[in-house]
Amino acid sequence: EIMPSLVGSEMCIRDSIWLDLKWIYKEDNDIYTFSGFFSFIVGHIFFISAILQRFAEWDKIIYIVLPVVISLIAAVGMLILEKPLKMNYGKFKVITVVYTFIVALLAFLSGSLALMNGFKIMTLNLMFAGGIFFALSDLILSGTYFGENKKRPIDIITNHTTYYAAQFLIASSLMFLK
């Protein structure tokens, strides 16, 4: 039962490596950015599959369907708000929409299943908190990657703070799997 979560964690580590390499090899920026997106998507899919495998109660399907719908709305909303938020996703538009859906789904699904269980399952609670921190981190990061005039020191500090908090919470959630 723990294997999908471990693979998810490993894929997220790869994401960090790919995205760091884009700063070293600037001429290959796009391939490293796409690789980072892809690794994170795959990692989150493993986290989501682990959550569904372990905690889903298919007779309570609303706790699964509702997070999917909300995540789709978040992804479409991100696309609709590109211009008003002065963002330019360019060639990364499609993968950004997919990425937004998957990251939102991890947060909303773990939160929904935590709610279904009365917030009594620490793995789900920590995964939910970690998912929220990932979403916040990525909102900040999207501004620094795709926004106008959003590479301020405060953005970099808050991005790293929320990102590492997310990593810590999700990794900690594995300790409570039974």
Task: Please give the residue ranges for each predicted region.
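Single conserved hydrophobic/aromatic residue that forms the stacking wall/gate
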Residues: 1-13
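Structural signature of hydrophobic alpha-helical transmembrane segments
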Residues: 9, 37, 58-73, 124-133
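C-terminal ends of transmembrane helices
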Residues: 15-28, 78-94, 142-149
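Cytoplasm-facing juxtamembrane segments at the starts of transmembrane helices
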Residues: 28-36, 61-66, 86-102, 150-155, ...
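Helix-coil boundary and interhelical linker segments in multi-pass alpha-helical membrane proteins
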Residues: 46-64, 111-126, 172-178
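C-terminal transmembrane-bundle signature of multipass membrane proteins
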Residues: 106-113, 127-178
